[in-house]
């Protein structure tokens, strides 16, 4: 009725695609006269729900859905007598109503007793909670503070309830659950998807800039299944800026910083260019740009200064009316610079007014969701505006394609679009900025080149987003997990799992804990609180392969192992508890799962083997007659603590001191006379020992302590848990969607279904991970550890069944997969594919439903196993032929921390192995690859490596991390200097250089680029070359673009790249021929050649 009174035009229902839900807080002044005749005033704060959407033609619309309320649940202690109609309940209700600040919320209908099932534990089937509804978020949090006594400073006494119960003992739920999530789950509406409305009314006054705006009733809205596979017409645009930045550590805050160009590429084919330039050059610039055949619909906006440019950008973006704006690396650069410049020029509010809402200003939000407090320049941010999604396409690629070596726009465009950026350098950009307001033929030509470069960057970003259908992926994940699109994009797994679990708990009438983020929520220990303690259990089972070349290898895989384990064993928060946990159920109602965990203890198989290898190594050392210069260094992970750092050279029984450098710049020894680079050539015994040692060190580095325990949990059988039902629902939905894909012919509909089934799969597999995250939203140690233990038991059971019942040997097994040795008998007529499928079916029959062992379609004629997660195979086709190319799995050819040269040099010797070459041919192939590098015929682009650079903090300052009590330089842990305080006062520059020298080489190079005012690192991965240095402390890497722009600044260290081939190819040689000196024989001439060159260079310098 209220909606009808506030509107004057009515129309029938319609379908809309909703992509953004917003709850708007409105205030209304009220006044009254009390008994004493005093005029009193107060504010009524209400929550109004809006839905920003598009219709079937792509026109934007806003649905105003009226007032909504937010809920809160109060949990009293188990022994507290809360009975309906009792005297205690009446007193409790009166006390709770006193703590409610809003007059309208004090109605008794807003404070009710409800029965709900607790999420954690196997106690009572239901428990009594107090449900309270509020008309505002402010009123809800004020109520909590009053009950706990935190509404005043200093804190006062908490509220007192009957039976001497203090308000501090009450636990609150749903405090941090967003109001829109509560409302949408209650009304079964999707966060992204098609909805069907009831009768629509046009309001008298419009509050948004949308094409259409209606008022309608929230209960009349329902999800539209008929249009589920219809792709919405979403208008989007990509933008890019060009700016002069003088201090990259604080971009945009320097007095001489300036944004002088912004480009916008709209999905309808329109381009916009906003540039600071003389007004009379607009026509010439348009004519110059339109000579390019790709630019036909361009609008140029010339501004006289930077303030005008920022205001014009705001005006143009609003006039476009797009539902999403995106860019490449905008969160870490473009948005940061624009916000900094708007702050310096006092136009922040105008700049942020880029959304559809007229009455709600935009705000700056970090990608973690924080909108309050001081935001550091190093924090990634985005502009949070109503009805317009702010997306970073680079972040989409980082989360989707995690194995790319780098995430620069140039590289990603070349890989996915077969396109490239325009060849504009930093020098060109700086030259244009220095002559920005000049008019000459050279300046006009340069202005046109840079403008085209900026426009192309925006176009490439838009094309990449469309090419990979990232928006479709985001909307499908948002629909399935009941999570806002922007939250799916930025906050990843834990937040999605929280929203999904809340939806399921609300549907099943389960009280879900959400006390995370609320300090001192309750002083008493609860089950949920104990779940956040550090987890202590061993990981998945891995059977290491015996290195070697195998023929006829098949693979089997447990389909969705962890999700199906949850279904098969009824694993949930409310069904899995410790063995001795008290319960109202008898032992007959439980299933007991027992196992042993041994990590780092004397029973750990890794430690047992390591102890055995140490004894063997000691015996070998006693009987070895070779001359010892010092302690042999085995790997970079196992360095001697005392004594000279010497590397053994097994060649002609001679020894020499040498330097062995690795990616992190560490050195075993130093020798200024001989700068010889040679890798440690290890025997198979030493290699095996180093591999075991590496496992131990990795376990310690991950924070795992020594664990030696017999574990046991009990699982309730009489009550179905929420997690099994949720996982089963997701898997069945995926199966149904994949079935529908077979009958769909429309490419757009098929693409939507494909993204939908992938979202179902990712979500189902993420549930196990969310229970095991100790710092997650909903941790559960018991579920995580029993799921992992059952996974180990399942794969071990499968291996044993294959061995005992079918006489099949398992070569290698990891987590949920196993590689088996098939019969290699030419006289046998048995089809290997049929045999593997029958084996999988037989093993499946022994497992608990719905667990299934699936046979992979690929049979490998040959497989070279090198170690854990490291093997190379050649596929066998059904006609008896073999594949020409090899399948590379986690060797240097697919790892992104190796250069293209190392990858290309590694492949020819391996191909020789699969061609049944001799040992001499293998050595010759290695020598040929090295010779190509020594002849300097390899371009520097092939020598480029990439490495991750984490956050370096705000202004490169040392900060104490209160959580770990460690001194941090950004995200890097460093040791604090003993004289830190004195040096900070007397010589801060030296102190900064000292800490920088303690960082890894890529991080040092990133800081050096900042000091040089070079462009920031895109995607958190820096490209560099390894170069020669004269001193140990010098940085042995150089950024690739700086190396190209400054020829002669450094010399490529060829021997470093040759050394990178030693360990990987030695593994191949040991696996095939059991020889460790193959690579050493191949590279020996190059080592001596490099040594002679170094001596000649030294003598030449001395003679000069």
Curated annotation (Swiss-Prot):
<dbReference type="InterPro" id="IPR036397">
    <property type="entry name" value="RNaseH_sf"/>
</dbReference>
<dbReference type="InterPro" id="IPR023211">
    <property type="entry name" value="DNA_pol_palm_dom_sf"/>
</dbReference>
<dbReference type="GO" id="GO:0003887">
    <property type="term" value="F:DNA-directed DNA polymerase activity"/>
</dbReference>
<dbReference type="InterPro" id="IPR006133">
    <property type="entry name" value="DNA-dir_DNA_pol_B_exonuc"/>
</dbReference>
<dbReference type="InterPro" id="IPR043502">
    <property type="entry name" value="DNA/RNA_pol_sf"/>
</dbReference>
<keyword id="KW-1194">Viral DNA replication</keyword>
<dbReference type="GO" id="GO:0000166">
    <property type="term" value="F:nucleotide binding"/>
</dbReference>
<comment type="similarity">
    <text>Belongs to the DNA polymerase type-B family.</text>
</comment>
<keyword id="KW-0238">DNA-binding</keyword>
<dbReference type="InterPro" id="IPR006134">
    <property type="entry name" value="DNA-dir_DNA_pol_B_multi_dom"/>
</dbReference>
<dbReference type="Pfam" id="PF03104">
    <property type="entry name" value="DNA_pol_B_exo1"/>
</dbReference>
<dbReference type="GO" id="GO:0039693">
    <property type="term" value="P:viral DNA genome replication"/>
</dbReference>
<dbReference type="InterPro" id="IPR012337">
    <property type="entry name" value="RNaseH-like_sf"/>
</dbReference>
<dbReference type="InterPro" id="IPR006172">
    <property type="entry name" value="DNA-dir_DNA_pol_B"/>
</dbReference>
<protein>
    <recommendedName>
        <fullName>DNA polymerase</fullName>
        <ecNumber>2.7.7.7</ecNumber>
    </recommendedName>
</protein>
<dbReference type="GO" id="GO:0003677">
    <property type="term" value="F:DNA binding"/>
</dbReference>
<comment type="function">
    <text>Replicates the viral genome. Host DNA polymerases cannot substitute for the viral enzyme in this process.</text>
</comment>
<dbReference type="GO" id="GO:0006261">
    <property type="term" value="P:DNA-templated DNA replication"/>
</dbReference>
<dbReference type="InterPro" id="IPR050240">
    <property type="entry name" value="DNA_pol_type-B"/>
</dbReference>
<keyword id="KW-0808">Transferase</keyword>
<dbReference type="Pfam" id="PF00136">
    <property type="entry name" value="DNA_pol_B"/>
</dbReference>
<dbReference type="InterPro" id="IPR042087">
    <property type="entry name" value="DNA_pol_B_thumb"/>
</dbReference>
<keyword id="KW-0548">Nucleotidyltransferase</keyword>
<keyword id="KW-0235">DNA replication</keyword>
<keyword id="KW-0239">DNA-directed DNA polymerase</keyword>
């Amino acid at each position: 009725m209220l909606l009808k009174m506030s509107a004057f035009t009515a129309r029938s229902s319609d379908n809309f695609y909703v992509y953004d839900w917003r709850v708007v807080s409105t205030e209304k002044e009220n006044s009254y006269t009390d008994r004493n005749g005093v005029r009193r005033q107060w504010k009524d704060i209400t929550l109004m729900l809006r839905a920003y959407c598009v219709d079937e033609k792509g026109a934007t619309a806003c649905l105003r859905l009226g007032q909504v309320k937010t809920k809160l649940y109060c949990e009293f202690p188990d022994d507290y007598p809360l009975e309906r109609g009792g005297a205690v309940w009446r007193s409790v209700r009166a006390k709770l109503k006193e703590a409610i600040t809003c007059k309208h919320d004090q109605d008794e209908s807003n404070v009710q007793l409800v029965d709900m099932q607790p999420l954690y534990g196997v106690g009572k089937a239901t428990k009594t909670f107090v449900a309270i509804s509020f008309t505002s978020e402010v009123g809800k949090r004020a109520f909590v503070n009053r009950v706990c006594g935190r509404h005043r400073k200093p804190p006062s006494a908490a509220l007192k309830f009957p039976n001497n119960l203090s308000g501090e003992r009450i636990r609150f739920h749903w405090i941090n659950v967003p109001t829109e999530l509560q409302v949408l789950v209650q009304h079964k509406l999707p966060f992204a998807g098609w909805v069907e409305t009831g009768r629509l009314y046009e309001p008298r006054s419009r509050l948004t800039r949308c094409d259409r705006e209606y008022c309608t009733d929230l209960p009349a809205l329902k999800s539209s299944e008929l249009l589920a596979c219809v792709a919405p017409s979403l208008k989007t645009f990509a933008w890019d800026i060009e700016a002069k930045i003088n201090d990259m550590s604080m971009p945009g805050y320097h007095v001489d910083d300036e944004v002088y160009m912004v480009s916008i590429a709209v999905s309808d084919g329109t381009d916009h260019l906003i540039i600071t330039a003389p007004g009379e050059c607009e026509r010439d610039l348009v004519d110059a740009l339109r000579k390019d055949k790709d630019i036909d619909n361009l609008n140029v906006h010339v501004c006289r200064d930077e303030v005008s440019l920022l205001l014009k950008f705001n005006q143009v973006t609003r006039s476009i009316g797009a539902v999403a704006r995106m860019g490449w690396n905008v969160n870490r650069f473009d948005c940061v610079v624009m916000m900094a410049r708007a702050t310096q020029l006092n136009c922040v509010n105008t700049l942020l007014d880029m959304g559809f809402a007229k009455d709600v200003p935009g705000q700056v939000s970090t990608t973690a969701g924080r909108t309050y407090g001081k935001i550091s320049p190093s924090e990634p941010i985005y502009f949070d505006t109503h009805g317009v999604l702010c997306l970073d396409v680079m972040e989409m690629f980082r989360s989707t394609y995690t194995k790319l070596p780098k995430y620069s726009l140039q590289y990603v465009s070349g890989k996915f679009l077969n396109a490239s950026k325009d060849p504009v350098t930093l020098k060109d950009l700086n030259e244009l900025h220095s002559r920005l307001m000049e008019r000459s033929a050279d300046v006009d030509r340069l202005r046109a080149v840079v403008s085209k470069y900026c426009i192309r960057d925006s176009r490439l970003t838009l094309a990449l987003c469309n090419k990979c259908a990232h928006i479709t992926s985001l909307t499908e994940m948002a629909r399935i997990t009941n999570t806002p699109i922007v939250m799916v994009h930025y906050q990843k797994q834990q937040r999605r799992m929280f929203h999904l679990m809340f939806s399921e708990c609300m549907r099943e009438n389960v009280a879900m804990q959400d006390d995370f983020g609320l300090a001192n929520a309750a002083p008493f220990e609860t089950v949920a609180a104990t779940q956040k303690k550090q987890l202590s259990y061993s990981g998945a089972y891995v059977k290491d392969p015996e290195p070697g070349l195998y023929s006829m290898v098949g693979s089997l895989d447990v389909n969705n192992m962890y999700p199906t384990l949850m279904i098969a064993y009824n694993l949930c928060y409310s069904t899995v508890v410790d063995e001795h946990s008290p319960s109202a159920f008898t032992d007959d109602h439980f299933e007991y799962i027992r196992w042993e965990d041994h990590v780092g203890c004397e029973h750990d198989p890794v430690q047992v083997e390591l102890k055995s290898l140490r004894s063997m190594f000691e015996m070998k050392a006693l009987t070895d007659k070779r001359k010892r210069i010092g302690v042999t260094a085995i790997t970079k992970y196992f360095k001697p603590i005392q004594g000279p750092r010497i590397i053994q050279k097994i060649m002609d029984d001679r020894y020499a001191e040498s330097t062995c450098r690795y990616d992190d710049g560490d050195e075993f020894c130093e020798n200024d006379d001989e700068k010889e680079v040679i890798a440690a050539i290890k025997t198979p015994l030493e290699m095996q020992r180093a591999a075991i040692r590496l496992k131990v060190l990795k376990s310690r580095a991950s924070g795992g302590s020594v664990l030696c325990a017999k574990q046991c949990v009990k699982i309730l059988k009489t009550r179905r848990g929420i997690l099994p039902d949720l996982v089963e629902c997701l898997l069945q939905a995926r199966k149904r969607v994949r079935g529908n894909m077979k009958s769909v012919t429309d490419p757009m509909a098929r693409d939507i279904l494909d993204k939908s089934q992938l979202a179902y799969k990712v979500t189902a597999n993420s549930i196990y991970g969310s229970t095991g995250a100790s710092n997650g939203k909903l941790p559960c140690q018991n579920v995580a550890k029993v799921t992992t233990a059952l996974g180990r038991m399942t794969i071990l059971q499968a291996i044993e069944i294959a061995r005992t019942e079918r006489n099949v040997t398992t070569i290698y097994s990891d987590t949920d997969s196993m590689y088996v040795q098939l019969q290699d008998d030419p006289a046998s007529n048995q089809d290997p594919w049929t045999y593997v499928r029958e084996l999988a079916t037989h093993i499946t029959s022994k497992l608990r439903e719905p667990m299934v062992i699936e046979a992979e379609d690929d049979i490998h004629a040959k497989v070279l196993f090198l170690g854990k997660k490291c093997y190379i195979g050649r596929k066998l086709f059904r006609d008896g032929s073999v594949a020409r190319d090899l399948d590379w799995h986690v060797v240097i050819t697919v790892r992104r921390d190796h250069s293209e040269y190392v990858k290309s040099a590694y492949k020819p010797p391996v191909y020789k192995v699969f061609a049944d070459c001799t040992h001499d041919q293998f050595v010759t192939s290695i020598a040929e690859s090295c010779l190509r590098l020594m002849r300097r015929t390899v371009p520097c682009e092939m020598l480029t490596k990439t490495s991750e650079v984490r956050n370096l903090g705000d202004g490169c300052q040392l900060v104490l991390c209160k959580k770990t009590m460690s001194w941090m330089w950004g995200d890097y842990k460093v040791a604090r200097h003993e004289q830190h305080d004195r040096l900070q006062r007397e010589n801060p520059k030296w102190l900064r250089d000292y800490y920088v020298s303690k960082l890894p080489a890529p991080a040092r190079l990133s800081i050096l680029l900042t000091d040089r005012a070079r462009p920031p690192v895109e995607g958190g991965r820096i490209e560099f070359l390894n170069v020669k240095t004269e001193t140990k402390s010098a940085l042995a890497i150089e950024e690739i673009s700086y190396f190209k722009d400054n020829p002669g600044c450094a010399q490529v260290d060829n021997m470093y790249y040759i050394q990178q081939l030693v360990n990987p190819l030695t593994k191949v040689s040991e696996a095939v021929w059991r020889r460790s000196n193959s690579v050493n024989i191949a590279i020996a001439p190059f080592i001596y050649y490099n040594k002679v060159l170094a001596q000649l260079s030294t003598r030449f310098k001395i003679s000069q």
